[in-house]
Amino acid sequence: MVSIVNIFMDYWFAEIITIGNEVLSGKTVNTNASHIGRRLTSLGFTVRRITAVMDEVDEIASAFREAIDRKPRVIVSSGGLGPTWDDKTAEGLAKALGVNLELNKTAFDMILEKYMTRKIPITEERKKMAYMPYGAIPVENNEGIAPGIYVYHNNIDILATPGVPREMENVLENFINKMLRNRSNLKYLEDFIYVENVMESSLAPYVKELVKKYDIYIKTHPKSYEMSHPILEIQIAGSGKQEEEIKVKIEKVKFELLDAIKKLNGIIRNSL
C-alpha cells in the first residue's frame, strides 16, 4: 500500500483509544475508530495512532498515559462508560491523570433527569455513570444515558465517549461544537480516482514522484488482487490555510495521475 504522510499536517496530532474486550476479540468491528478518525481528519488533525485495549483499569490508564506523553492536541476514546462492572474507562482515565474518581454532580443531574422522566429509579449501577475524574466536565449525550467525559490536561483536549456508535457520534459532535479548545486553522480536502487494470506496484513510482512534487498525501487502496483484474481506489488529500490552493493542487495531481493511468492502459471508473 503506497502511503506518504503530508508533512505540514504533523503539528496537529490526534490519537484515538478504543476500549473493549469485544473489539480485541474480533466480535465487534472497530467502526468507532474509523468515524472518529475521519471526523478529526476533517478538522485538520493528523491521527497519529489508534490503540485498542482491554476492559482493565491498568490497561486503560497505561493507554491514556502513553498517549499524553506523546503530546498530541486531542485524545478521543470510545467505550467503557456504561453501568456494568466492566465499564472502567472513567477509573482508568482518573488513574492516568493522577486524580481521584468522584461523583460529578452535573453528570449525576443529567442522568437523574433522564431516568426520572421515564419513572425509572436510580440504582448504584446507574449512578456509576456519573463518576468521573476530579475536574472533568460531562459532555451531553442526546442519544443515550452516559455522558461523555471531557478533561483539558497539559494543553491536550481529552474526550471519553460511550461505545454505542450513535452515542459516540453525538457526544463527539457536542464536544467539537462546545468544548474543543485546540482547533487547527488548516482546511482539509480530499478527492478520489477509481481505476481498473492497473496494478498498485505499477502506479507506485508515479505516486512517489507526485508526492515529492506537490507535497501532498496520496494513498492507493487495492480493492482486488494485484495479479488478477486489479482495481484501485486512489485517495488524494491535502490540508492548508487556503482552501483554493488545496483544490488547485489536488486537481493538478489528478490530471497527472490520470495521464499516468492512461499510459498504463488503465480504465477509469466513476465509482467502485
Swiss-Prot record:
Database matches in HAMAP family: CinA_A
PANTHER family for this protein: NICOTINAMIDE-NUCLEOTIDE AMIDOHYDROLASE PNCC (PTHR13939), NMN AMIDOHYDROLASE-LIKE PROTEIN YFAY (PTHR13939:SF0)
Similarity comment: family membership: Belongs to the CinA family.
Protein's recorded name: Protein SSO0103
Organism of provenance: Saccharolobus solfataricus (strain ATCC 35092 / DSM 1617 / JCM 11322 / P2)
Pfam family, one: MoCF_biosynth
UniProt xrefs under SUPFAM superfamilies: Molybdenum cofactor biosynthesis proteins
